Amino acid sequence: MLLRQIFAHAYPFENSDSGVDFSSPDTKIQAVNSGRLSFVFLAEQNRIKAFLKIVKPGFVRDNIAFSVLCTEECRLHSSIPTFQTYRGKNAELHQTVPEHLEGLSGELSLFSGQSITLTEAALDGIDEIPETLTEIPGGRRGQLALMEKLGGYIVKVSRTCSVVTDNLPKGLETADPAGFATGRQVAREDFEISEYLTQLHNSSDRKELQYHIQHLLPNLGNSPEAQSFREGLQRGDLEVILDCFNQLEKNIHESLIDNPAPNVPVLNEVKPANVGAVYDAAVNRWEITQSFDFDNMGFGTSENGDQTLLEKDLGRTLSFFAFDPESGEFYADNAKATIKGYLERLPEKMNEAEIHRLQDYIQLGIVTSYFWRSSYLAEELQGKPTEILLARPDPGVHVTQIRSFNTWLKTNPFADMVEALQSTPQMERHRDIEREAVLFRNSPDYHTKRAEGTLPAYDTELDAAHDKINCIE
């Protein structure tokens, strides 16, 4: 009843073109997902479906509005498929839950102040990419074809949404582009430690961390997830992760001082839960059919000085798709395929600094996953278990992933692998196409097509030109 009133207030039927009347008892509302930062509900009325996302208490972020704008930008001006975002009260694309609602006794203590967005839903469901690599259709061939498609998708999303960044809402606070401030904050909150202690400056810090963790371990229960988490902490997983995190921060910051990155405004976390795709086994080809959840964006402008890195996004994607989620094994062929698709969409080769940063960002992606997975167990670890039950995968696998990657690097220079991929005649032809695309995006013709609404057709032609080169291969 409370949710129905919240949704009806934010999206009044008479003012909304969504086609869903939330005040009607005929409208069915069900929870379909609970992620780390948000609840997702599915509303259905007369076969019309819509997704409603509510940001969880404590996670209100100013870039929610920006991510909604990016969703609309992709839908209207590119070949990237997204759902339509509906406008609510005052024609706004995102809503805020009020403190009180007329006719409702008591305030909305749980949801008050949270952001809501409403988007259409696919009538036949979402084309989900399996979380487990072995479940991806087509076996190894299907995996590699998907990896290549996702590599190019990373660049397409950033390029398309950069237009939104040029017109950021005033007063919008930027996210943390390099990922270190956010990562350190999550580590502090997960394990109730100070920022200073996350730095592990000396042996005294390490002893203090070990003592602190030992003090928390009795809080963990007897579930398989909690027991596995306890075993990982006892063998020093958190120290391994923090050591890796601190070294990566040093490496990347030093790299950016010596070789500043170009300002690439948009980063989107490309992982199975954020992309829908279908597989054509006859030609071993994937088509991306849905793109959503742009909440994990970092962006920068010339005014705030943030320099976001496109290779960071590729590294994050590789941390999902180039490692076995259960054994932690590194799959070099998956990494090569994803990097190949990424390189095909760049107008120039990656330079040495970018390649080294990519290697670091793969590991940072793994470290980030450890922190986020730990957060699902954090309340129990701190003696404050919650009644909200979520899937809680073992964070310890990410320590294994880091070790597996480092073992591979000992005999396989990462830079040599990337250089071999980007130094083929076919790759030069891909770059020629992208150089022409850069010229187009800086021409009057671009603005004409944007005004006409014909940019998606241009984007589709660009996709076809790249596909033609790959078919000849």
Where are these regions (language model features)?
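Juxta-kinase regulatory segment immediately upstream of eukaryotic protein kinase catalytic domains
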Residues: 1-23
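Active-site acidic catalytic loop and adjacent metal/ATP-binding pocket
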Residues: 33-44, 246-312, 445, 451
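ATP-binding glycine-rich loop module of kinase domains
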Residues: 41-62
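Conserved HxN/HPN-centered segment at the entrance to the catalytic loop
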Residues: 77-92, 96-97, 102-105
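Conserved short submotifs of the Hanks-type protein kinase catalytic core
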Residues: 100, 118-126
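ATP-dependent phospho-/nucleotidyl transfer catalytic cores
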Residues: 106, 110, 129-156, 163-267, ...
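Active-site activation/catalytic loop segments of kinase-like enzymes and analogous catalytic loops
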Residues: 280, 307-348, 364-384
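ATP/Mg2+ or Mg2+-diphosphate-binding catalytic cores
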Residues: 368-473
